[in-house]
Structures are given as C-alpha cells and as structure tokens.
Amino acid sequence: MCIRDRLKDAVTLGADYVDIEAGTEKYLIGELVAQIEKHHHRTRWIVSSHDFSGTPPDEALQKRFDACSRIGGDIVKIVTHAHAMEDNLRVLGLIPYARNKGRAIIALCMGEQGKISRVMAPLLGAAWSYASLEKGTESAPGQLTAEEMKLIYKLLGTGER
C-alpha cells in the first residue's frame, strides 16, 4: 500500500491529523484535501518540511515556512538536523514568526544536538513536540521518550505537556 492510500485510509478512519511533505506532488495533496473535505474536516493536516542535512540560515527557514504556508494545511511543521546548539535557536525562532502570521507551527530539530528544541518548542508556543513511547522506537534521531519528556517538564516545573 502506498503512502497516498495510507493517508487516505487514515482520513477515512478518522485520524486526528495526517502529515504530508511539502514536496509532494500537487495533485496528491489535492486528493488528500478532497478526502478530508469528504469526511467533513474531521482530520486536520500538517504540511511538513524536513532537512536531514542541517539547519539553513534564518531567511531560508522563513522562506521554507512561507512556502509550506502557501500549500495550506492546519499546521506547518519545519524540522532540521542540528549540528550545533545555535541551530536550535534558529528553528525555534520560527515559532514567533509563525504566530505573527497567524499560523500554527511545529518547529524542532533532529539529532543529538536537537534534543533541547524538542523540549523547548511547546514551551515557546509550538503546537506540540514528538516523543517515542519507549527507547528503541524513535522515529527520528534525538527523539526523547515520553517518560523522559514528562520528567524534564516536571523538573522544569512546567507540568506535563
């Protein structure tokens, strides 16, 4: 079964969200949106952009966000690979940028250096972060477990997210 069919099935079954990469062919995005409309918008959709090689400069990140926003979706997701701690600051800087444009965003970094962005993103106004259920089931490098995230938020005194 191809990803298009899996996304359509997710919509039919009432998934809360589906995630589609910004580089997906327009006609496939159109098919997915039609499926969402057919099911009365029960499912919301995320337009995502992943950069596995690194984190571009601020201006390039903002252009990427704007391009994803033009595609549509309920949430824009920008994920890059952090090679240095400063990369986290650039990606997290998209959160106020998105807020100023009236858009919901998920902005975080992958990799060992990106772990802090996964914790900080929701605290700074991102829609959410991602965590694995247990060690060894991570969907991206640097992803913490749900238990680790809960412990960090408890230690920070922010409560569970």
Language-model region placement:
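Short, small-residue-biased leader/transition segments that mark boundaries at the very start
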Residues: M1-I3
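Active-site loop-to-helix "anion-binding N-cap" substructures in soluble metabolic enzymes
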Residues: K8-T12
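Short, well-ordered alpha-helix to beta-strand connector turns
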Residues: G14-A15, G73
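Catalytic alpha/beta core domains of metabolic enzymes, predominantly
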Residues: A22-R161
